[in-house]
């Protein structure tokens, strides 16, 4: 039980639902509330499916594509960096996701890389490699972490009402700065792994 809880805490910290709130709100701010909820449920379910696939078959997928784990880290860092720059310096039209106003996101950037990002996918591969006989526990931990993320992100409209548009914009820029640092670290970790390999 302790292993499940510790793994779930680790996974939810990596998923970072509170950090992702401003990005989700920004990407979906031109969408009607009912449609926004449906999109979020769809994107979160896609993210869960991707995470489960990587938990069970991540190493095999990378081997099949002749990709190394550091490739996931480097490419993920680049994508997150570009998203972060758009958060800090939003264009006059559209939003920080790079989508035109009113256009619906599909898979990128919400499901991947924000919820099911390179860090969580690499962590799931690592956990499945370290604990091959405890896959049931790992699945439960993943479902708990995903469930917590699901609940927090579905309450984004509540945060929007509490913070207001200016508050969300300020939070978005702050998270953009943090995301730049996280993306840079992810990129550097990938480079470090590549140089060691």
From Swiss-Prot:
Listed transmembrane segments: 4-24, 45-65, 72-92, 106-126, 139-159, 174-194
Keyword Transmembrane: yes
Main location as per UniProt: membrane
Cellular compartments annotated: Cell inner membrane
Keyword Membrane: yes
Gene Ontology CC entries for this record: plasma membrane
Membrane-side (Cytoplasmic) residue stretches: 25-44, 93-105, 160-173
Domain of life: Bacteria
Topology of the protein relative to the lipid bilayer: Multi-pass membrane protein
S-S pairs: none
Keywords associated with the record: Cell inner membrane, Cell membrane, Membrane, Transmembrane, Transmembrane helix
Periplasmic side, ranges: 1-3, 66-71, 127-138, 195-197
Family per similarity comment: Belongs to the UPF0056 (MarC) family.
Record protein name field: UPF0056 inner membrane protein YhgN
Organism per entry: Escherichia coli (strain K12)
